[in-house]
Amino acid sequence: MLALVLIKNRNLKILRVNEKKLLKKQYKIKIAYTGICASDIPRAYSSGAYNYPLIMGHEFCGTIVKCGKEAKKYKKNDFVSAYPLIPKCKKCESCKSENFQLCKKYSYYGSREDGSMSEYLNVNEWNIFKLKKSIPPRLGCLMEPIAVAFNIFKNITNRDSKILILGCGFIGLILSGILNSKNFINVDVLDKNVHKLSKLPNKKFVKLKYNLNFFDIKKKYNYIIDLIGNEKSLSTSLKKTIEGGKILLAANVYKDMNISRENINLILRKGLTIKGIWNSTLKRKGNNWNQAQEFILKNKNWILSLISHTVSLENSKNIFKNIFLRKIFNKNKNFEYIKCIIKNN
């Protein structure tokens, strides 16, 4: 089968690779679309992979073309996506409470094992999420990041709260859409790219340009959601959260941080709550994936407008380099990228 293979750091190749044997409780998925996650860029270009060679891709959808001998829950031709995290124990306290994303013994499609940037992928029955036929395939591959946005949202409880989103990438935009759909109105969003801010779902949401010094922000907020994940964004969050406020950290961090004693003391003096959020939940109650599917069905056109680039699997190699080097431009020669999806023929 055809696959985009990360041979080593900064070395991606389109190759013919052997298909893996289908295990008894797996389904062979013919991949329709794969989303490129922001984490895939450092994985490919900043020595972020756990092992090589690797087929990346953890945001995907497709059709079941073959069922393992003991795979009975789904059937051939079902349209599906998949929860990419594979808990290995199912016995720890996190797994018992259905917080599978907190399990320490896990694998992960597209990260710790091969993923969906290929023609086919064998997926465990446990990980399969069946999609409604009314979900457009171009949006089916975005289930995972939208579910992550819902995992962030569940921590924001007061509709009258003042909220600041730091970072207006795809998940930040989706979170703004969720807040808008739930009638939150006191929402400010900060990003350095005007074209991203232009996609906000509500004209009343305040747009903050990134080249404004973070610390020049005049307001203080009940909730700050840090989707940037650097020293400056964390320091800003500590300074700009009100007494008793909450900081939600939901970005992968790729460099060490030095946080001043003054800022650390703000956590104590202001009684701040800092919470880390990673991945999404598959709980029977409050399942982020069910929420994501319903959100897609109600907001198809807006979410489609967030897909800035679509490339074929055969031509997918160069898009990674262009994103990494910020060489995706509009006619005014401004960097213009939100979300890229890879299409299989």
Listing of model-derived features with the role each one plays in the protein:
Residues 232-298, 344-345:
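Glycine-rich phosphate-binding loop and adjacent beta-alpha segment
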Residues 88-166:
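NAD(P)H dinucleotide-binding glycine-rich loop of Rossmann-like/cofactor-binding domains
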Residues 287-345:
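C-terminal hydrophobic helical "lid"/dimerization subdomain
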Residues 81, 224-225:
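N-terminal Rossmann-like NAD(P) cofactor-binding module of classical short-chain dehydrogenase/reductase
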Residues 215-224:
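A short acidic, Gly/Pro-enriched loop at the edge of an enzyme's catalytic core
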Residues 20-34, 47-93, 127, 132-134:
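Glycine-rich beta-strand-centered segment in the early N-terminal region that forms part
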Residues 136-211:
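Mid-domain Rossmann-like dinucleotide-binding core that forms the NAD(H)/NADP(H) cofactor-binding site
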